[in-house]
Amino acid sequence: MQCLLVDDDPDDQEVFLMTLEKINKNIECLTANNGVEALSLLTSQETFIPDYIFLDVNMPKMNGIECLKNIKGLAHLNHCKIFMYSTTSEASVLEKSKKLGATDFIVKPASPAVLEETLSGILNN
């Protein structure tokens, strides 16, 4: 199983990666700090085709919404499940994510236990 985590916050990346590895020791997860880096990884590495992409909404250079639009234009990623996440739960952001083809939206939880429960549900579904 492969995934791509796109987040500009190194602390959030670390917690997310540790949680993913706790749930599935065999997961291969690459990281990108923004949408530009994510698209570069997804278009330049034909051997890396993630099953899951986790996109933070608010990032510099290219935010998660713009990145999602671009990813949806890449035919080789049609099977990929894309989860947007953010500390915001604004209806407009949730709606836009769904409209653009995100699989679901995760509101960043306050605790690692909630994150583990959420990610476990995603990966084991």
Region spans (language model):
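Receiver (REC) domain active-site loop signature in two-component systems and cognate sites
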Residues: 59-62
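Short amphipathic alpha-helix used as the core "switch/output" element in two-component signaling
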Residues: 40, 65-78
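Active-site residues of response regulator receiver
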Residues: 55-56
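Two-component/phosphorelay signaling modules centered on CheY-like receiver
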Residues: 10-30
